[in-house]
Amino acid sequence: MSVHEVNHPLVKHKIGLMREAGISTKKFRELTSEIASLLAYEASRDFQIEPRTITGWDGSKVGIQQLKGKKVTVVPILRAGIGMLDGVLDMIPNAKVSVVGLARNEETLEAHTYFERFVGNLDERLALIIDPMLATGGSMAATIEMLKNNGCLQIRVLCLVAAPEGLARITAAYPEIDIYVAAIDERLNEQGYILPGLGDAGDKIFGTK
């Protein structure tokens, strides 16, 4: 599979607005959700459809198209992934929600799990993992492993900003997984933050420091 950087003018404009140092919590949340919707649109481009006949407004039969047999679970990585959830559900409202809680060790930059709750029948579902920042790739790799260990066979990743280091880690370990990203930035700093990045997305979404 591959990395898909969404080079749409609206996506690039919105990501640019998110980089402003003085952006408000309200605006950051709104833009996170809006970009998440656009990423979900791109990630669902290959969903199959099938014909169906319905009764139209005037009582006549109307042929329409509907999604065919695609069961989706959206998997936000706590806590920042919650900021993308509504945007994805706006596009795929029937999706089930699974949750993974991970915290990063600031010394090793690796993730440890403190919570997980998956929907049933993961082997029949496409999992869309959502997390605004793909930095070292530690949290993403841990989430992918948890999904695989619980039987999930189809996984895609949606994130706002990714560092080359994180992308390299995930694509090397999981070449079968598609990654949809709004922007690929320059690098990580010594603390594992993406540059130029967005800062701490969790703090900006939740209004904490």
UniProtKB/Swiss-Prot annotation:
GO terms for biological process: UMP salvage; uracil salvage. Its cofactor is Mg(2+). 5-phospho-alpha-D-ribose 1-diphosphate binds at R79, R104, D131, P132, M133, L134, A135, T136, G137, G138, S139, D200. Its EC number is 2.4.2.9. InterPro entries: PRibTrfase_dom (IPR000836), PRTase-like (IPR029057), Upp_B (IPR034332), UPRTase/APRTase (IPR050054), Ura_phspho_trans (IPR005765). Keywords: Allosteric enzyme, Glycosyltransferase, GTP-binding, Magnesium, Nucleotide-binding, Transferase. PANTHER family: ADENINE PHOSPHORIBOSYLTRANSFERASE (PTHR32315), URACIL PHOSPHORIBOSYLTRANSFERASE, CHLOROPLASTIC (PTHR32315:SF4). Gene3D superfamilies: 3.40.50.2020. The keyword Magnesium applies. One of its GO terms (molecular function) is GTP binding. Allosterically activated by GTP. Uracil binds at I194, G199, D200, A201. Pathway: Pyrimidine metabolism; UMP biosynthesis via salvage pathway; UMP from uracil: step 1/1. This is Uracil phosphoribosyltransferase.
